[in-house]
Amino acid sequence: MSQESDNNKRLVALVPMPSDPPFNTRRAYTSEDEAWKSYLENPLTAATKAMMSINGDEDSAAALGLLYDYYKVPRDKRLLSVSKASDSQEDQEKRNCLGTSEAQSNLSGGENRVQVLKTVPVNLSLNQDHLENSKREQYSISFPESSAIIPVSGITVVKAEDFTPVFMAPPVHYPRGDGEEQRVVIFEQTQYDVPSLATHSAYLKDDQRSTPDSTYSESFKDAATEKFRSASVGAEEYMYDQTSSGTFQYTLEATKSLRQKQGEGPMTYLNKGQFYAITLSETGDNKCFRHPISKVRSVVMVVFSEDKNRDEQLKYWKYWHSRQHTAKQRVLDIADYKESFNTIGNIEEIAYNAVSFTWDVNEEAKIFITVNCLSTDFSSQKGVKGLPLMIQIDTYSYNNRSNKPIHRAYCQIKVFCDKGAERKIRDEERKQNRKKGKGQASQTQCNSSSDGKLAAIPLQKKSDITYFKTMPDLHSQPVLFIPDVHFANLQRTGQVYYNTDDEREGGSVLVKRMFRPMEEEFGPVPSKQMKEEGTKRVLLYVRKETDDVFDALMLKSPTVKGLMEAISEKYGLPVEKIAKLYKKSKKGILVNMDDNIIEHYSNEDTFILNMESMVEGFKVTLMEI
């Protein structure tokens, strides 16, 4: 067939015919008619359409309404002979011009087998959720991207040009009687003047078969760009491009260090237990648009630097957790401020060092987080330089089923206690001023012979806002810390989800798939072993108020009895003479000393020992320094 005839094709949709007088030994009723008729015997009432609209199935209601109206048309006004589909070029051009009612009125009723649809885009997409597995591989047909009609036996391809691009309906097959030829109806279109949509040639899928009153939303790939579209978004509406909009900006409202190393990310000083604001916003090419699909999920986590492997990080986290006052102590907490909750939702504490939430890229999101560990909490040695930590933010597409984030950024932090961050900044400012002063003095001495005056060298201003640095690596998995006991509890309550193929096909939310199996994340479950030490030893540093040097009290057992024995051994005070034993915190709170405080909250702590004589004995108070 010539190229000229191909360029003049109009949309001709082939639909199954209803009751028709027999001819050419064909049956009067085809199986397609019987299948479609089964959905049209009951009229589409207003209640039916309303229910379908409520369920988000507006396209199905429109498609069924069109087919229902089609079967009301008399047979002699809606039929066209199929045998003319491959005749001469004149017949082909003549058939392409049958879009008007005048041409349709000249058709003969006995030979007509094809319905001519006017230039109305019809969405005949089918729902993938209703697939029958037994039919997925029976009718696998591959079609080339050529725009010409394909002369395949039993198959007629009709080309559409001047219409709004819509999804193509997959090949539909129904069983036929003996002696009947198998016919497959294919709808194909070409897109024009729609630069935002990818070419849909070869978009046919064999495994998308369902009832004709269903719809589906499909994701497709063109080169390296992925675009996602819901069924409710029209063809003329903006399509949310996940990759092109994957540029985000995160800021931390904390003082930035004045000594930034070249080539490394920003360094920020934080105070332990103090809340800091993090702002998340989109800065990509799509920022000026109102995205119809605009929800993303971000995970904020505290991790170690990249030079620490997974085993090292887990080792540090387990050591830190073993020294906490309570097993429920988290590394990272998020505040329940109203200012924060107005911009985010679906908050989940997915790990002890990570929280996740959803937010709208059309709006700026703001959260308040606090870090509960010091940089020096990962070593038992005193005076050791603290380990650098990072606040890392991974942002995932909310509807994308990939474990790969669309954006990742980080900020280095050092965590201090008791306003140590402010002291560190002041020290850096003093050092910078001294260095600037020395440099200015030496330069003035070199230019002493000249009469010109040197301008003062401006000092680097401290910034109260730190910008996160984008990480190019989107494939490495962050280390999420969940203690063994808490992990077992999560398993029993069904709150841990694994990254499996079944779940990926099920379409669950991304964060629920972030946890890898316990054997992969934490290593194989260790077998029960005897404790290396029969009892846990506790070491206290105490001194009297008049002394300058501390004494070390080694408790043979982490109990009140063990503490009294250590005091008796060190200071010669009989155990039976100790009537009361108290602990006074830094805030001045006086509590009775018990075994739990000694075992979990007092190891390597420093105290001032005060012994007061009473009638019934001595009252011993350990005042925390």
Swiss-Prot record:
Its GO biological process terms?
Answer: anterior neural tube closure; bicellular tight junction assembly; brain development; camera-type eye development; cardiac ventricle morphogenesis; cell adhesion; cell junction assembly; embryonic cranial skeleton morphogenesis
UniProt entry keywords in alphabetical sequence:
Activator, Corneal dystrophy, Deafness, Disease variant, DNA-binding, Dwarfism, Ectodermal dysplasia, Membrane, Non-syndromic deafness, Nucleus, Transcription, Transcription regulation
**Classification via Pfam families:** CP2 (PF04516), GRHL1_C (PF25416)
Grh/CP2 DB domain location is 244-482
What GO cellular component is one of the record's annotations? nucleoplasm
A GO molecular function held by the record = DNA-binding transcription activator activity
Report the subcellular localization.
Answer: Nucleus; Membrane
Induction section of the entry: Expressed in proliferating cells, the expression decreases during senescence. In keratinocytes, expression levels decrease upon calcium exposure.
Renumbered to this chain, region (Transcription activation) spans 1-93
- Which parts of the sequence are marked as the site Important for activation of transcription? R423
In residue numbers, the region (Disordered) covers 1-24, 82-112, 428-453
Q: Which pairs of positions does the record mark as disulfide bonds? A: none
InterPro entries reported in the protein's UniProt record: CP2, TF_CP2-like
Biased composition annotated in UniProt, kind: Polar residues: 98-109, 440-451
Expression by tissue, per the entry, reads: Expressed in keratinocytes (at protein level). Highly expressed in placenta, prostate, brain and kidney. Lower-level expression in a variety of epithelial tissues such as thymus, lung, salivary gland, mammary gland and digestive tract. Expressed in the cochlear. Expressed in corneal epithelial cells, but not in the endothelium or stroma.
Annotated phenotype, changing R423 to A/Q = Loss of activity as transcriptional activator
Q: What does this protein do?
A: Transcription factor playing an important role in primary neurulation and in epithelial development. Binds directly to the consensus DNA sequence 5'-AACCGGTT-3' acting as an activator and repressor on distinct target genes. During embryogenesis, plays unique and cooperative roles with GRHL3 in establishing distinct zones of primary neurulation. Essential for closure 3 (rostral end of the forebrain), functions cooperatively with GRHL3 in closure 2 (forebrain/midbrain boundary) and posterior neuropore closure.
- What interactions and quaternary structure are annotated? Homodimer, also forms heterodimers with GRHL1 or GRHL3.
Q: What illness does the record link it to?
A: Deafness, autosomal dominant, 28: A form of non-syndromic sensorineural hearing loss. Sensorineural deafness results from damage to the neural receptors of the inner ear, the nerve pathways to the brain, or the area of the brain that receives sound information. DFNA28 is characterized by mild to moderate hearing loss across most frequencies that progresses to severe loss in the higher frequencies by the fifth decade.
Q: Any extra remark in the record?
A: GRHL genes (GRHL1, GRHL2 and GRHL3) show a paradoxal lack of redundancy despite their extensive sequence identity in the DNA-binding and protein dimerization domains and the fact that the core consensus DNA binding sites are identical. They have related but remarkably different functions during embryogenesis because of their differential spatiotemporal expression patterns during development.
Protein family according to the UniProt entry: Belongs to the grh/CP2 family. Grainyhead subfamily.
Q: What is this protein called?
A: Grainyhead-like protein 2 homolog
